[in-house]
């Protein structure tokens, strides 16, 4: 065996995430924010998980901090299935972009896919709030869903910052919800981090890691 890694450290390596303050993120059915910490630390409430990153050594502290949000792409898919079944995901993004920032008061809490670690394993469910029958339409719901997911990400990222992580850059694959300009712009604006998209996946990283581990490449 020349290389081994869990799915998220492996994904982070495929996205060139090695240094403190760098973040690897995915936004599929569930969403992940995986950041690199340069000092040994942990969250006392275990809302995020800490373990050795792929480039950790006894002389170099590189720890991966993992946040998982269960209600990410599954919320977007639920909205598509139940609110906008007649349009594509790309058209959903256009609908969302037609609504002002903040969805004119509509708020969606995206925790509807089971217990959330970031909430200390509470199962609070998803909720939609602030709908005015005289003002709001489905475009507001589409946008509020994406905004709610972003703020759930940022809630977890604040925990990482409390652990000493200076979040500067988010790396993500060019796929799933990161295909939405609105999602990307909102996440960048709220988190204050830049976002870089990569045409890659974890399988490519595993192959490269195995070759490096075998000593074929240095």
Residue map of PLM features:
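Active-site core segments that coordinate phosphate-bearing ligands/cofactors
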Residues: 1-171, 176-218
């Amino acid at each position: 065996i020349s290389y081994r890694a869990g799915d998220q450290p492996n994904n982070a390596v495929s996205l060139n995430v090695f240094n403190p303050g760098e973040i690897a993120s995915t936004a599929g059915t569930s969403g992940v924010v995986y950041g690199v910490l340069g000092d040994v630390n942990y969250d006392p409430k275990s809302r995020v998980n800490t373990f050795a990153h792929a480039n950790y050594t006894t002389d170099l502290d590189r720890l991966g901090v993992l946040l998982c949000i269960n209600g990410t792409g599954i919320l977007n898919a639920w909205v598509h299935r139940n609110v906008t079944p007649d349009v594509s995901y790309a058209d959903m993004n256009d609908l969302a972009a037609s609504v002002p920032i903040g969805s004119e008061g509509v708020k969606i809490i995206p925790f509807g896919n089971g217990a959330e670690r970031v909430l200390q394993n509470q199962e609070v469910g998803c909720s939609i709030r602030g709908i005015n029958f005289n003002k709001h339409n489905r475009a507001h719901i589409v946008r509020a869903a994406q905004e709610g997911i972003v703020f759930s990400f940022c809630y977890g990222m604040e925990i990482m910052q409390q652990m000493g992580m200076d979040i500067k850059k988010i790396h993500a694959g060019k796929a799933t919800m990161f295909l939405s300009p609105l999602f990307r712009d909102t996440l960048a604006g709220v988190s204050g981090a830049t976002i870089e998209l990569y045409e890659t996946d974890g399988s490519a990283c595993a192959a490269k890691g195995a070759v490096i581990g075998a000593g074929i490449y240095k």
